[in-house]
Amino acid sequence: VKVAVTVDDFVLWDGVPMPDGITPLGITKSIAATLADHGLTGVYGFSHTHRLDSDPGLMAAWEAWVEAGHHLGNHTHLHAPLRWMSGDQYCADIDKAEGLIGNLIAMAPERYFRYAMDMAGETESKRGRVEDHLRASGYRNAPITAWFGDFTWIIPYYRAVVSKDEDAKRMLQETYVSSAVGQLAAHAQLARRLFGQDIPLIWLIHGTAIATDTLGTILNAFVKNGVEFVPLQEAMSHPAHFAMPPCNSEFLRNHLQRYAIAAGIPEPHLDPELFGRVITAAPVEGYDTVTVFEQRMLKPLAQRAGAAYDWTW
C-alpha cells in the first residue's frame, strides 16, 4: 500500500505537559532527521499557530521544518473543532494562521489545509462555508485516511518519563509501534472494502516525545510490511481525497472513518483493553490522562473559541 506521511502539531497544544529537556523545536528537528534517515523529504507538517501568541520564539520550529526540506500547511490558529465555531469564525481562524506562517506555507508546491482533529463539522452548510473559503484562499483540504489515536500515549509517556518507570516506558513504546502498524493495516483493509482497491493512504503522526523515540521503528516496520512512501501530492490525486464523506456528529473520526460510517461499515479503533492499559500506565498524582486533556487543553480551548464545552471520548 502507498502511504503519504504527514505530521501534525509539532508544536503541541497549550496545556500538554512535556518532560524536562523536551521542546517543540527539539521534537521538530528530531522528527525531521528521522524522516531524512528514511529518505523522506517534502513531508507536509500541519501545526496550529496559537502558541505563537504567547511565545513568538516558537516560530523557530516552523522554520526548522522548512529548513529540513519539508513543507507546511495551514491547520488553523486555535486548533478548535469546527463544531465549536461558526463557519465565519473558523474561516477567520484559518486566515489568522495564514497571517502568521503564510510566508512559509507559500514555499510548498501545493497549498494544503487540514481541519483541526480532522473534524470537518457537523453540518453540510457550515462545512460548505469553510470549503468555499478554502477554495477562495487557494487551499485544498488534506484529510487523514490512516491514524492510530497516537495522542492517547502523550500523557502516559510523560508520566513514565518523569517517574522513571522504565517498564511502563517500554510497554508504551512497544504498544505505540504495534498500534501504528496494526491500525495502518486496518485502515488499508477498510479502504479496500469501501473502494474495491488499495488507495494511497494519508497517515498522521503528531509531534510528541514518544514519536521522537519510536518513529524510526515505525517507518522500518511499515517498509517491512510492503509500504511504499509517496508524496502527499500523489496521495491527494486519488478521488477518495477529493470527495467529502457526509458530515456526522461523531468525535475524532477521520476522513476514511466517516466514509465507513456513511456506508454502515465498522470502522477501526484501538482495542479497548489496550486503550485502558495505555491511559492508566505509570500513574502520577494530578496527571490522569483524561483529566489533563480536558482540564488543561480542551476546556481552555473551548473558552478561547468562545464555545460551550462539548466533547465525547
Could you say what each language-model-derived stretch is?
Residues V1-M119, W203, A221, A235:
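Active-site beta->alpha N-cap acidic-glycine motif
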Residues P17-M18, R51-S54, V66, A80-L104, ...:
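Alpha-helical scaffold elements lining the catalytic groove of polysaccharide deacetylases
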Residues A36-G39, A142-P143, L194-Q197, I205-W313:
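C-terminal domain-boundary segment and adjacent tail
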Residues L58-A61, D88-Y90, P156-A160, A243-S249:
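Short low-complexity, flexible loop/linker segments enriched in glycine and/or proline
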Residues A61, R129-V130, T217-I218:
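A short acidic, amphipathic alpha-helical/loop segment
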Residues H71-N74, L100-I105, D165-L184, R253-L274, ...:
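Short, basic, helix/turn surface patches
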